[in-house]
Every structure is written in C-alpha cells, then in structure tokens.
Amino acid sequence: MADNSYTDIMEKNHMEIPWHDYARQDGNILIDKAGLIEKASVIGRVGLIMLSCGTGAWRVRTSMNRLSKELGVTCTVDVGLMSIEFNCFDGNDCISQSLSIANTGVNTSKLYRMEQFVDNFPNEEAHLTGEEIHRRLDEIEQIHAIYSPARLGLAAAIACCAFTFLLGGGPIEMILAFVAAGIGNLICTKLIKHHFTLFLNIAVSISASCFIYAAFLKIAEMAFNVPSIHEAGYICSMLFIIPGFPFITSGIDLAKLDLRSGLERLAYAIIIVMVATMFAWIMALLLRLQPMDFEDLNLTPVLHLILRLIMSFFGVFGFSIMFNSPAPMAATAALIGAIANSLRLELVDLTGMPAPAAAFAGALTAGLLASFIKENNGYPRISLTVPSIVIMVPGLYLYRAIYNFGIMALSDAVSWFASAIMIIIALPLGLIFARILTDKTFRYCT
C-alpha cells in the first residue's frame, strides 16, 4: 500500500472553483462585451484573491467596485473574514454568488500585485478576453510564500529579539528569545505548509518556543552561571504569533461599519490570542517559568533612543518579512515603524503620557508617513501601516493578564487586561484618523 500523507488522501472541505469554465473558449469576445456570468466570475475572483491576502472589507469592496464600473455592471458586496456574497446587475439580468476561501492569512506581496492588477485594469485587462484575464489571475494566485520556512524563522527570531529589547529585556533575554522564536516560527511555518489546523499550529509552536527558551536558559545557567532571573524573556519568544493584521483590519472595518468583517476578524484575532496565551500559561506551569519584570538596563536617554530606533527598525522588518513582503517593502515599513514606535516610547518616558494615548500618537504618525510614502512608491497602504505598528500590539500585557487569571490573581489580571484593551483600541484609531486626514475617499460615508 502506498505511503500517502493525510493531505494526499483526504477530501477537501472547500472545493476548488473551475474559473476557466465560466470564460468563453473561442477567444473572440473581450471581457467588456462578454455576458454577465463571465464578468461576474472575474469580479468575484478578484475579490476572493484580495480577501485571501488578509486585507479588509473596504479594500476588497473597492477593488470589486472598480472592476464592475469598467465592465458596466452594478455590484453589491458583503464581505466577511473567509467569504464574499455579492450580486451583479447589468440592467437585464442578475447573478448572485457566494464564494469562500479555505484559510485566511497575510500575503502583502500578492496584495501588491493585485492592487497593480486593479489599477491597470482599464488600460490592460479590459481589452482582454475572460480566459486571458483568468490566466493572469492564475499567475497572481500562485504567489505563495516568497521566503523559505528557514528564512521566516530567521525573520521571527530577529523580530522577537528586537521586541525583547523594546519591552525592557537585556542581551541574555534577547539571545534566548532569538533562538526560541526562530525555532518556534520555523515549526509553525512547516505546520502551515502541510495544512495542519490553526489550533494545532498555535499550540505546538508556542509550546516549542517556551520549552526551547527554558532549555537554553538552563544550559546557560549550568555553563555560564547565568541567573534564573532572565527567565522573564520567555514571553518575548512567542510574540511572533501576535495576530496584528486581523486586529488592525478589524478596527478599520468597524470604522467603516463593515460590522460582519470587523467582528469576524476580531473574533479570529481573539481566538489566536486565547489559544496562544493558554498554552503559554500551561507551559509556564510545567517549566516553572514566571513573567517577572526585566532588570533595569541603566542606559542614558540618548543611547536608549538610538537603540530603540535600531531595534524598532529590525523588529518591524522581521514582522513585515513574516507577512511575505518583498525586502524593499519591508524596509520601507521598518523605517516608518522605527520613527513611530520610538516616538511612542519616548512620549511615555519623557512626558509621562499614558500608554494608550502614546499608542494613538504612534499609530497616527505611522499612518501619516505611510500615506506620504504611498504617493511615491505605490505600495499598498495597509502593507506599510500594519507591520509598522504590529510591534506596538501589547502581547506581553495580554499574556500577563491570562497568566494572572490562571493563578487567580484577579486584580493584577484585570489591570493588565484593561491596559491591553486600551492600547488595542488606540492603535487602529490612530491609523483610521490618519486615513481620514489623508484619503478623501475614506473620509466620507459613501
């Protein structure tokens, strides 16, 4: 009997759509002269690919609307996290379709290509047949991870190492977090590649990161007499799992009253956080780890600012690579994040500004910078803003809240949780108001 993996023999729960069956095969009729069914197949597929990239309902609907206008079709769209329901009207006929994706994720490289496709549609694709357009969409749809699992593991290692410093950790915590996060995300990427379910991916990768951090700390204790107080950094080794994209896009969707998409994305992000923090808490109990405070680094204000700028750059760069951004796009997001996150931290330290207010200021700055840069290089705004502020998402606060809930220290748990919620609310608000100030199409209710 052949040795087949489960993914080779199991029946797919989401059947693939034969898109080319909806296009005329004679190759003589351009898409703008085609029938409503053929036009709807192109419009729906564009929306579905946009949705699979992780972008919000506003961007998905905008892209579908632009194609509809070019094709002489009226389109109404309802967008969720995993599915799209839309209706197309041409004055004579009406077609309703419900489309869904098998899994959700983030792919900023594919999103960039799709935005170029939509922008160029009036000049290029509108003069092609439906079959030719679907072939081009086939090519874009094949853009999967442009980095190997090893490189994505390295990106997570760099991001979490930088994150550790920004949260107050020292060199030892940074080194241990580098190793543990790198291996943890490598495992997570491998599991995703083999299509394992979400809960299993989170549980295994988080457990592995905690175990590796504790194991290497124990080795360092025995070999170099490193004190056990450095166990505080184990939290930082699992911050690669933070669902920054769905958290932020949910806020943007809610701001535009796309309640279905916003609430579904928020629920998805909460699921990831709850599963991750629960397994991290269980591992902490098994390994006897405690989320203690970091030791004071005793840095001068100027040196601290310089290091914050550097670490913010590398932290955002790492997260952006994990979102499948090309290196130039990741570097651009990293420059924005270095400025915005350092501003946030300095406002807290130098002015005593509450952390949520500083988070709003940092996110607003990131949004304004991204809008300015978008005008010059054409990168999708969300591909710059979300990576640049994901480093501000209070993963440490969320974990400490769940940890204290677990040990029934309810007063501390509520305090950490309230602080986290305030910051999580402030971050998308900053991006939303930056968008309102710089994008007139977003400013009005249409």
Regions found by a protein language model. Give the residues of each.
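Soluble N-terminal domains of membrane-associated systems
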Residues: 1-135, 139-141
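Hydrophobic, membrane-facing alpha-helical anchors
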Residues: 121-136, 150-161, 178-188, 284-291, ...
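Core alpha-helical transmembrane segments of integral membrane proteins
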Residues: 146-249, 321-323, 327, 332
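Alpha-helical membrane-inserting segments
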Residues: 162-167, 183-192, 208, 212-220, ...
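Structural signature of hydrophobic alpha-helical transmembrane segments
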Residues: 166-180, 229-243, 295-311, 351-365, ...
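Membrane-interface helix termini and inter-helical loops of multi-pass transporters
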Residues: 220-229, 287-301, 404-415
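C-terminal transmembrane helix-loop-helix hairpin of multi-pass membrane proteins
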Residues: 233-238, 249-253, 257-273, 335-446
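Generic multipass alpha-helical transmembrane bundles of integral membrane proteins
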Residues: 240-245, 268-350
